[in-house]
């Protein structure tokens, strides 16, 4: 599908966001490991969380929606999963594959985890290494999926104290889930904090030791049946926060947005660039902070982004690059080499696409240098590289660029935000 975007005169209205993808994945997996019925309110229809739900069903877990759309998942406890009769298809979802691998590593039956062509190119040694250190028997194909996990011995996995070599919520969560099946205390040590949904939702002990976070899974930790309420996805909100900032005479409202501090570094970056964003009605929903956001048009200035900020805005860097291209002055993004092993090489994809729109971009091994010249992009033909975040970031760029922008393979936005293009059109004023 080719999506056509014309320059917008303004953006107005209240944005309808999809449910938070990260929390949705975890709600399905943890509900499967609980004992009894859990309910998930606002579970999304986007492709990635559906991949997780499909895998849970393949493991013998009953899950379905009632007439009000509430998802009920009937968990069978840590030892109640059934051997899968077919490979566990994770689709395009790295979160599904990495977190599910932690669960499967502790089972007394074997499993194979696979995914689409893109997912089979993403690195999986980063989860295989700690799982093998716990005694899991895992085979990869040249460091990638399919992942073959052989049956675990009845005495369980070995406990592990694991220091994350890089900040990664997926690797951390994989080890924590495997730790539920270990014969002793498992500790994951973070030097740089990453998103913390897993430890929040599991209710794990977290200790601050010498500037590091120690997340602890005790041998006897159980997973209760819980009713989860999934807030709006902050990563989905990010596109409208940047769009509402860049398009003149705009005012957008985003309600019930997840505001987990490990996810919202974009707010700090945009504030530092000069954005006009307010957060109101802050509250706690389950284990997660939630609030309502209003964004109004503002002129931006360049900024330096790197270090400990990066793990807490890694998904937002493509749309930050759009903001930087429309700001006045230089923006430097560094320490973001993780973006080279996402659904596509996001650093290269954004550099290529923004240059096509007339931006001045230098690509570095771990980031980008963008010399902004105000909102002076020119419409052009660009490609999503079949990456949902690239597609949506370029949709935002198209709203600002003079003329018409076309985005090829734009249907991939449905991976995380099925109604994105309709929502963008609905709030746009020509």
Curated annotation (Swiss-Prot):
The keyword Nuclease does not apply. Phosphoenolpyruvate binds at residues 21, 94, 122, 170, 346, 389. Gene3D superfamilies: Enolpyruvate transferase domain. InterPro entries: Enolpyruvate_Tfrase_dom (IPR001986), Enolpyruvate_Tfrase_sf (IPR036968), EPSP_synthase (IPR006264), EPSP_synthase_CS (IPR023193), RNA3'P_cycl/enolpyr_Trfase_a/b (IPR013792). It catalyses: 3-phosphoshikimate + phosphoenolpyruvate = 5-O-(1-carboxyvinyl)-3-phosphoshikimate + phosphate. Keywords: Amino-acid biosynthesis, Aromatic amino acid biosynthesis, Cytoplasm, Transferase. It is found in: Cytoplasm. One of its GO terms (molecular function) is 3-phosphoshikimate 1-carboxyvinyltransferase activity. Its EC number is 2.5.1.19. Catalyzes the transfer of the enolpyruvyl moiety of phosphoenolpyruvate (PEP) to the 5-hydroxyl of shikimate-3-phosphate (S3P) to produce enolpyruvyl shikimate-3-phosphate and inorganic phosphate. Monomer. This is 3-phosphoshikimate 1-carboxyvinyltransferase. It comes from Salinibacter ruber (strain DSM 13855 / M31). The lineage of its organism: Bacteria, Pseudomonadati, Rhodothermota, Rhodothermia, Rhodothermales.
